[in-house]
């Protein structure tokens, strides 16, 4: 890559220099003008001149990341011993090491003949040196001695999300529902920072479960920025590039045309979120032919809410909130829409998942399957309704045939949203009474009536409280317009 266009900050604070801590919500104010002089060099063979691969800012000064010698990193990893090996892939190997100050680090040694070349090495150093957020992995430094290319990260003790979802040994406890929602919300915040805070926006392009690393308390951080691209600026709607990424996670429009947008990342996020919910791999060749692709398996199930409970990860053993499952699947389905324009922006996904993550579930509470919860229109989840109300007010959607097909549902949602945002109404008719009340079939009719009224009163109080939460969120955010419709949540 011969030229790296202007890369500025959407935040006010200036990033700390060196390999120190990262400041949430801020990014560097500097602009990067050049990372190399010859595109063919950066993509081709390795240059022995170290200076040719040191990223520099607009003033020609090396960027803030610490520069290590190969000797220092060899000592940190005990000369790259096998017992320090954390993992390996097409890019090379990752080792655990300890710096002279005792700090634990992860050292990624790039394979000189591997998939990640000099261009990807430079991009990753640049991105992680200039972007600072609590949900992005911290780059401590790098090494460009001779033909050696190494990256030094903070050590993430719990490994990757993939390690906790797939091929789990019998003696390992699977992730519970609360932790899964927490990881999803945190990863979405990292993606939101790249899309909305970085200026120009950054498209991650390789969002997958193996690139989400977990720290103490299962705190998620995005890693591996070698494929990241600067997003479109000005009047441009997309950037065109050769198709890169991982099969099973790539958005269909990007895979077919090479046209990349932030919505391409949203699709990839939907795949990972579906992995969290179902426990299935994005691509699993051990499954029957029709179930090998996770998204292809899930699409028909999205249209039948009665099948939603069967989509939950069997390792959860039923320990999840039924309503939370419906809401989570609605968010995943919206992210996975085939048309990029109809997917939500990641900021909207963050709002929805922050709500889901705040609704902690007691794993000792048995799952209650409501008869009407899976089949009646009243069982529509609130997260889906929240996205739908923004879509219904879109001028493009109001002119679409799908709007006419929805019929009375449209006016119902408009009335519900109006009452929700104004804080008026009983709460039950604000689209938030998704859990139907089943009266007691035992005892006298009067007794059954009292039980139903008491239960409905409790539901109303809960609905009003949650309506206020959604109302405040929607007022604080400018909801984007989306074109098209989402049939699976309208059925």
UniProtKB/Swiss-Prot annotation:
Keyword Membrane: yes
Location(s), subcellular: Cell membrane
Xref: Gene3D superfamilies: Phosphorylase Kinase, domain 1, Transferase(Phosphotransferase) domain 1
MF (Gene Ontology): ATP binding; protein serine kinase activity; protein serine/threonine kinase activity
Disordered, as annotated region: 1-55, 361-380, 385-491
Active site: 206 (proton acceptor)
Result of changing residue 241 to A: Abolishes phosphorylation and activation by CERK1
Membrane protein topology class: Peripheral membrane protein
Entry's Gene Ontology BP terms: innate immune response
EC number: 2.7.11.1
Post-translational modification: Phosphorylated at Ser-240, Thr-241 and Thr-246 by CERK1 in response to chitin elicitation.
Residues where Phosphothreonine is found: 241, 246
InterPro entries: Kinase-like_dom_sf, Prot_kinase_dom, Protein_kinase_ATP_BS, Ser-Thr/Tyr_kinase_cat_dom, Ser/Thr_kinase_AS
Keyword Signal assigned: no
Compositionally biased region (Low complexity): 418-429
Residue numbers bearing the Phosphoserine modification: 240
Assembly and oligomerization: Interacts with CERK1.
Chain's role: Functions as an immediate downstream signaling partner of CERK1 in the microbial peptidoglycans (PGNs) and fungal chitin signaling pathways that mediate innate immunity. Is required for chitin-induced activation of MPK3 and MPK6. Participates in the activation of defense genes during response to PGN and chitin.
Name this protein carries in UniProt: Receptor-like cytoplasmic kinase 185
Source organism (scientific name): Oryza sativa subsp. japonica (Rice)
């Amino acid at each position: 890559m011969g030229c790296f266009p202007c890369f500025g900050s959407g935040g006010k604070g200036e990033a700390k220099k060196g390999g120190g801590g990262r400041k949430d919500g801020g990014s560097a104010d500097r602009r990067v003008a050049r990372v190399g002089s010859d595109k063919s060099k950066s993509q081709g063979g390795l240059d022995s001149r170290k200076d040719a691969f040191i990223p520099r800012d607009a003033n020609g000064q090396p960027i803030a990341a610490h520069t290590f010698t190969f000797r220092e990193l060899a000592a940190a990893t005990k000369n790259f011993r096998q017992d320090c090996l954390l993992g390996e892939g097409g890019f090379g190997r990752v080792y655990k090491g300890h710096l002279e100050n005792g700090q634990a680090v992860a050292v990624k040694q790039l394979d000189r003949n591997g998939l990640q070349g000099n261009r990807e090495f430079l991009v990753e150093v640049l991105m992680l040196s200039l972007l600072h957020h609590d949900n992005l992995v911290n780059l401590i430094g790098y090494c460009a001695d001779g033909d050696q290319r190494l990256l030094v990260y903070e050590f993430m003790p719990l490994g990757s999300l993939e390690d906790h979802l797939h091929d789990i040994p019998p003696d390992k406890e699977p992730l519970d529902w609360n932790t899964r929602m927490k990881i999803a919300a945190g990863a979405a915040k990292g993606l939101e920072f790249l899309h909305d805070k970085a200026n120009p926006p950054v498209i991650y392009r390789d969002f997958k479960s193996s690139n989400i690393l977990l720290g103490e308390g299962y705190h998620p951080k995005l890693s591996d920025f070698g494929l990241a691209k600067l997003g479109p600026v000005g009047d441009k709607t997309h950037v065109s590039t050769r198709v890169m990424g991982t099969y099973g996670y790539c958005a269909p429009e990007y895979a077919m045309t090479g046209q990349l947008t932030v919505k391409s990342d949203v699709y990839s996020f939907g795949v990972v979120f579906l992995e969290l919910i179902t426990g299935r791999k994005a691509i699993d060749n051990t499954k029957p032919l029709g179930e090998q692709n996770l998204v292809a398996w899930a699409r028909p199930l999205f249209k039948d809410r009665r099948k939603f409970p069967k989509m939950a990860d069997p390792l959860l053993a039923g320990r999840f909130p039924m309503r939370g499952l419906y809401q989570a699947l609605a968010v995943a389905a919206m992210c996975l829409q085939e048309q990029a324009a109809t997917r939500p922006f990641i900021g909207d996904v963050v709002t929805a998942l922050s709500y889901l993550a705040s609704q902690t579930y007691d794993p000792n509470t048995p799952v209650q399957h409501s008869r009407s919860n899976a089949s009646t229109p009243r069982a529509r989840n609130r997260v889906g309704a929240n996205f739908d109300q923004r879509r219904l007010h879109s001028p493009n959607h109001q002119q679409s045939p799908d709007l006419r097909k929805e019929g009375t549902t449209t006016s119902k949602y408009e009335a519900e949203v109006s009452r929700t945002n104004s804080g008026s109404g009983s709460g039950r008719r604000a689209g938030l009474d998704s859990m139907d009340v089943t009266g007691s079939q035992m005892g006298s009719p009067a007794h059954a009536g009292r039980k139903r009224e008491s239960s409905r009163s409790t539901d109303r109080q809960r609905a009003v409280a949650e309506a206020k939460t959604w109302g405040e969120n929607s007022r604080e955010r400018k909801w984007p317009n989306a074109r098209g419709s989402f049939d699976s949540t309208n059925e």
